[in-house]
Structure formats: structure tokens, C-alpha cells
Amino acid sequence: MTVLAVTGTDTGVGKTVTTAALACAARLARRDVAVCKPVQTGTIDGDDDLGEVRRLSGVTALHGGWRYPEPLAPVAAAGRAGAPLPTRTELVGSVRAVDAAGRLTIVEGAGGLLVALGADGVTLRDLAHDLGAQVLIVVSPGLGTLNHTALTLEALAAHGLSCAGLVIGAWPAEPGVAELDNRTALEALAPVRAVLPAGAGAASPERFEALSAAAFDADWITSLS
């Protein structure tokens, strides 16, 4: 079982685009890859993270789970919809049902590392622990990112979990001093596995495939086990 969890330091940092780019790069590296999004909110506004992953990455082994209409944190969204939340056991089981020998299963969280996903307060950190998964952190290049990233790394280390690296999810076309300095500082915190350009999610599938292949090191993807 090879499970890689993807979290972000904030909303809007590019988790879904990063998930799609990683899945695309893994497909190009000839890995058997699946993407799992156990909890999705905001479906009333047309949010469909797995649909976006499919469109951009060309990966078809996609597995959803619990979906809630309003664009809120999962517990709030479920409460307002009058819908049940999954338990920790159900969430872990949903990912294990997707994984297979030799497969890389990418699990995209909802919100950040410690956002409650289930009825019992289970978080993506808990799922990573139960699944023996490393965690890839998607970060912003802007001000505040160093503190947010350090806090997320500390939260992983406190539970003995391994960080697979960082991805800068939306690198500006014209970075300023803050972005350039932050990029150097982020590289000192953890390996930066990829830097994706801002607006990458609007690219055509062909263009997205090219930028995904260029962004991620195929040897690193192959080594994930």
C-alpha cells in the first residue's frame, strides 16, 4: 500500500491543482495511480475537485466519498445539510478500498491538516497515521507562508508523521521580493517537490501535462513506496 496524503496550509493554495499535477506526472511515469477525495464540500456551487483532476490529469481511477452542498468546513456543511458525517473507520476503509499492490493512491484532504472530516473529529492527520501515509504540503509563496508551513510541519512531527515535501501551488508570473525570499526559506524547511505556476488549473490538458511533467521529478515519484 502506497498512500500519499495532500494537504494545504490554507484554502486557495492550490491543493486540487497540485493533486492533478502529481497524478498526471505519476501517470506519465507509468505508475498505476488513483486519486481519492473522501470528503468534498461546496457541491452546490459546482465544485467538483475529482472532475477537475480528471480533466487536467487524464487519470480515470477517481474515487469520491461524502459530499455536502455548501462551501463550508465539513462538519458545518454536514450539519446544515442534515447529513451524516463519516466515522474514522469509514474514512480509512474508503481509502483502503481504493488502494492496491503497486498503486500510488493520492488522498486529497478538505481544508488543512487539522480540519475535522468526520463525526468523531477525525482529521487528515489521523487518516495519514492510520494508513501509514506520508503527507505532501501545498503552500503559498506569499507573506505568512513560513509560519503556516512551520506549524503544519510541527503538527506532523508531533504525531510521528513524515512530510513528503512541499509544493508551491501558485507561483506568480512576476514574483516580488517576498515570494523570492520565501521560496528560499521554504526550501530550508522541507524539500520543495514542485513549483506550479499561478493559473495552471486553467491550462488545456495538453499544456497541463507538459507543465506537470516539468514540475515533478519522475525519479521521486517512482521512489514513492
UniProtKB/Swiss-Prot annotation:
Protein name per Swiss-Prot or TrEMBL: ATP-dependent dethiobiotin synthetase BioD
A Gene Ontology biological process term: biotin biosynthetic process
Family: Belongs to the dethiobiotin synthetase family.
Record pathway: Cofactor biosynthesis; biotin biosynthesis; biotin from 7,8-diaminononanoate: step 1/2
Alphabetical UniProt keywords: ATP-binding, Biotin biosynthesis, Cytoplasm, Ligase, Magnesium, Metal-binding, Nucleotide-binding
Matches recorded under Gene3D superfamilies: P-loop containing nucleotide triphosphate hydrolases
Gene: bioD
GO cellular component terms, semicolon-separated: cytosol
GO terms of molecular function: ATP binding; dethiobiotin synthase activity; magnesium ion binding
Residue numbers binding substrate: 41
InterPro entries the record matches: DTB_synth_BioD, P-loop_NTPase
Keyword check for Metal-binding: yes
Residues annotated to bind Mg(2+): 16, 49, 108
Statement: the UniProt record of this protein carries the keyword Magnesium: yes
EC annotation from Swiss-Prot or TrEMBL: 6.3.3.3
Intracellular or extracellular location(s): Cytoplasm
Domain of life: Bacteria
Matches recorded under NCBIfam families: bioD (TIGR00347)
Known function: Catalyzes a mechanistically unusual reaction, the ATP-dependent insertion of CO2 between the N7 and N8 nitrogen atoms of 7,8-diaminopelargonic acid (DAPA, also called 7,8-diammoniononanoate) to form a ureido ring.
Top-level EC class as recorded in UniProt: ligase
